C-alpha cells in the first residue's frame, strides 16, 4: 500500500482541491481511522502541545477510554511524560529492518504509558529531506496492519509546531476534530490563524472540523477572546502559566501523578472536563481565518 505524493491540482478524491499549486500528501482511503474519536492537536511551536496532549490522553484514560497518542515531531518527545522515556520512533524501527515493515512486531513501535495509554512516536525524515506526511501515513499503516486501532476509543495526534504544509497537515486527513493550543499573545494567535486556514482547506475534502481552542500558559484571555469572537472560535479549556505544570514535565509525569495541591487539583479537573466534553461530542466550528493585516489591526498593532 503506497502513500503517494500528490503535487498540484487533481480532478477529484482525497488530497485534491487543497489549494492551487500546493503540494499535498494523499493518504490511501483504506487508512481511514473509523473506530475511534480522532483529535489532532496543533499550535505555535513551544506552546505546550505535548504536555497538553499527554495530560488529555491521561484524562481520557481516567474516563475508562482506550487511548492511543501519536507524536508527529522529529524530536519524538510527545509521549515522554506518559512513558518516562524517549521511545524509538517508527522511522527508527523501520530503518533497523531496512524498511521491511513486515518484519516488525507491534512491541517494536508501540509502548504502554500512564494508565494504559498506548504511545507511538512517528518521528520524522532527516532534516531537509523527505516528507513528514509520509511518516504519518506509514505510522497509521503499521497500526492498521497490526490491528492496533480496532480496540482504541481515542486517538490523539500531537503535531509539530505550527507547520501546516502538505506534509505535517497530514494528520488532518485522519482527524475528526482539531484542537488548537494557544497563548494570549500575538505570535500564538497569528499561528492559530494559519492553522484555521489549513482546517478550512482540508475540510473541503476530509471530515476534519475545528473543535476549539485550548488556552495555555495564559493568565488572561482577552486577546484570544477578541480573535475567537471575530472568526467564530470557542475556548474549550484554560490553563494558566503555573509552575506546577512545568514541574510535572521535569518529573517525567502527567499532571495526574503530581502531589495534590489546590492548583494541581484545579488543573486536573479542567483536563477531566475537557476530556468529558470532547467524548460527549462537540459541534464543528465554521471559523474563517483573517488576513494578516486584519490580525494586526484586531490586536492593536499599527
Curated annotation (Swiss-Prot):
Molecular function terms, GO-annotated: 4 iron, 4 sulfur cluster binding; ATP binding; metal ion binding; oxidoreductase activity, acting on iron-sulfur proteins as donors; oxidoreductase activity, acting on the CH-CH group of donors, iron-sulfur protein as acceptor
The entry's free-text remark on the cofactor is: Binds 1 [4Fe-4S] cluster per dimer.
- Spell out the InterPro entries in the cross-references: NifH/chlL_CS, NifH/frxC, P-loop_NTPase, Protochlorophyllide_ATP-bd
State the EC number(s): 1.3.7.7
Q: Which residues bind [4Fe-4S] cluster?
A: 131, 165
Report residues binding ATP.
46-51, 75, 216-217
What's the cofactor? [4Fe-4S] cluster
Binding residues for Mg(2+), per the UniProt record?
50
This protein's record includes keyword Transmembrane: no
Gene Ontology biological process: light-independent bacteriochlorophyll biosynthetic process; photosynthesis, dark reaction
Q: Which SUPFAM superfamilies would you find in this protein's record?
A: P-loop containing nucleoside triphosphate hydrolases
Q: In which pathway does it act?
A: Porphyrin-containing compound metabolism; bacteriochlorophyll biosynthesis (light-independent)
Superkingdom of source? Bacteria
List UniProt keywords, sorted A-Z: 4Fe-4S, ATP-binding, Bacteriochlorophyll biosynthesis, Chlorophyll biosynthesis, Iron, Iron-sulfur, Magnesium, Metal-binding, Nucleotide-binding, Oxidoreductase, Photosynthesis
Keyword ATP-binding attached: yes
Reactions performed catalytically: chlorophyllide a + oxidized 2[4Fe-4S]-[ferredoxin] + 2 ADP + 2 phosphate = protochlorophyllide a + reduced 2[4Fe-4S]-[ferredoxin] + 2 ATP + 2 H2O
Query: What would be one Pfam family of this protein?
Result: Fer4_NifH
UniProt family annotation: Belongs to the NifH/BchL/ChlL family.
- Name the HAMAP family on file: ChlL_BchL
This chain's function reads:
Component of the dark-operative protochlorophyllide reductase (DPOR) that uses Mg-ATP and reduced ferredoxin to reduce ring D of protochlorophyllide (Pchlide) to form chlorophyllide a (Chlide). This reaction is light-independent. The L component serves as a unique electron donor to the NB-component of the complex, and binds Mg-ATP.
Q: Subunit structure of this entry? A: Homodimer. Protochlorophyllide reductase is composed of three subunits; BchL, BchN and BchB.
- The molecule here is called Light-independent protochlorophyllide reductase iron-sulfur ATP-binding protein
Q: What is the lineage of its organism?
A: Bacteria, Pseudomonadati, Pseudomonadota, Alphaproteobacteria, Hyphomicrobiales
